[in-house]
């Protein structure tokens, strides 16, 4: 199937019980918790709680729903697609006004999204996109440009190639800690990074494996890389948590993270920024999890039948060590 993530120009802008393998909650935010009073009811199917980024994202959504007076029905899929599909079907049966979700993986959503469409329930993709030829199955996408995030990470390495050849052999050997297999950020960040580093033939990815966006996963994969690969110069982790796990593995091997092995990550959550300020991470590309206010605004508009952009991309920045130290005192997540 041809990948279609929405062709429109990006616009930047600053229940029924589930099975035992998932969980859900009703975080009613309306004046009396009754959607019959004219307030909007949103069903939100979250990926899980696999990282600091995801926890901040969930809090932003819950807090923003309360502030907007939106009745929020929330489910945690624990990183399993089947749990998200069950949650979405539950929301359809409950006749919520709008469904939002962050897809665990890109593919396999057409059937359940067609069910939502037949029920006249609009869908908002949040944080992650889906791979579908039928873009009528959702109203809009809200989140980051993951390809650009990967490109920013790779461009920093190209720009700092001279300092990144740690072993001095003339080649820059990179190991990559990938996110969840099949997930949009893992696919797109990897593609963006590969595109950027192709400008310098000295840079190559010598090993790449999923750490599933978790700290433990990053640590385990990095331990394996340190045993199987010689002369690692750089780690590119698809999120901060895997990078923090890699730091633990590097230290356990008697090496100094940020010096003996350079580390580039994506997210810019507090733990990652703290490691960056301490010099254990060398560069972080921001991925803003605070999508709640924009999500509630979009939900109100689509329920009212208003036109919304097909793609809403958040504005984000990058951080080096000095910038991280400056930003940390006021960091929200």
Spans of model-derived segments:
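Bacterial Sec-type N-terminal signal peptides, specifically the leucine/valine-rich hydrophobic h-region
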Residues: 15-18
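Repetitive helical segments and hydrophobic/amphipathic motifs
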Residues: 11-12
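A residue-level marker of the well-folded mature domains of exported/periplasmic proteins
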Residues: 2-8, 20-333
């Amino acid at each position: 199937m041809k990948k279609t993530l929405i062709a429109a120009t990006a616009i930047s802008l600053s229940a029924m019980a589930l099975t035992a393998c998932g969980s859900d909650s009703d975080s009613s935010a309306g004046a009396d918790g009754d959607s019959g009073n004219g307030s909007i009811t949103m069903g939100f199917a979250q990926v899980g709680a696999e990282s600091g980024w995801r926890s901040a994202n969930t809090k932003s959504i819950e807090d923003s729903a309360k502030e907007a007076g939106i009745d929020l029905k929330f489910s945690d899929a624990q990183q399993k697609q089947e749990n998200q599909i069950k949650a979405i079907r539950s929301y359809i049966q409950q006749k919520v006004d709008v469904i939002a979700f962050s897809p665990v993986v890109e593919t396999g959503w057409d059937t359940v999204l067609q069910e939502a469409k037949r029920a006249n329930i609009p869908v908002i993709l949040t944080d992650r996109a889906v791979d579908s030829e039928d873009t009528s199955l959702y109203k809009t996408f809200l989140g980051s440009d993951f390809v650009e995030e990967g490109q920013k990470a790779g461009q920093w390495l190209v720009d700092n190639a001279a300092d990144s050849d740690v072993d001095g052999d003339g080649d820059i050997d990179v190991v990559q800690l990938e996110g969840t297999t099949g997930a949009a950020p893992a696919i797109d960040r990897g593609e963006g990074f590969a595109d950027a580093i192709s400008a310098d033939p000295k840079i190559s990815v010598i090993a790449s494996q999923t750490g599933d966006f978790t700290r433990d996963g990053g640590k385990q994969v990095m331990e394996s890389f340190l045993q199987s690969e010689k002369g690692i110069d750089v780690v590119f982790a698809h999120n901060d948590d895997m990078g923090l796990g890699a730091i633990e593995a590097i230290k356990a091997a008697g090496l100094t993270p940020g010096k003996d092995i350079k580390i580039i990550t994506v997210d810019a959550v507090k733990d990652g920024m703290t490691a960056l300020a301490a010099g254990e991470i060398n560069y972080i590309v921001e991925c803003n999890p605070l999508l709640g206010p924009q999500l509630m605004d979009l939900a109100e508009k689509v329920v009212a039948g208003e036109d919304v952009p097909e793609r809403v991309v958040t504005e984000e920045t990058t951080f080096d060590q000095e910038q991280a130290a400056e930003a940390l005192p006021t960091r929200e997540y």
